[in-house]
Amino acid sequence: LSYKYYQPANGSEATDNDRYDAMKAAVENGAKVVVCAGFMQTAALQQAAAQYPDVDFIFIDGSPVTTEDGTALTNVAAIAFQEEQAGYLAGYAAVMDGYTKLGFCGGGGGENPACCRYGYGFVQGADAAAAAKDVQVEINYSWQYGASFSASPELQTMASGWYTNG
């Protein structure tokens, strides 16, 4: 078994074209299976899978991919995580550890399904633990999406305000 890692040009500023070019390079260099991780690969993967029907694509943390007319691309296997379960456990554990003023800031890389699922699970877990302990819990819940996965000054200011206010 051999492999090669192809990274899109422009790092965290990569475009759909950059991602497609990385997939295309992998196929042109003989790849029979291309693994793509993250929802941001969707548009490039849609294009590459349609163009290379004899290549299998594994889409980690993504949804099934279709053509523009809605036809499923059978050479794409989508593997989705259940982030809501991890979020549920985090929310539940926080309340069971005695925290009653919680904050959740979802986002990073723009609006994305993984952060939404995690956030929904977090709130449900905190609610379940609050019911089990018969306590009131306050949750500050924000969907101020940053443009990248790094902490923006705006998000840092928001989180700092949460800490300042308890």
Where would I find each of the regions flagged by the language model?
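A residue-level marker of the well-folded mature domains of exported/periplasmic proteins
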Residues: 1-166
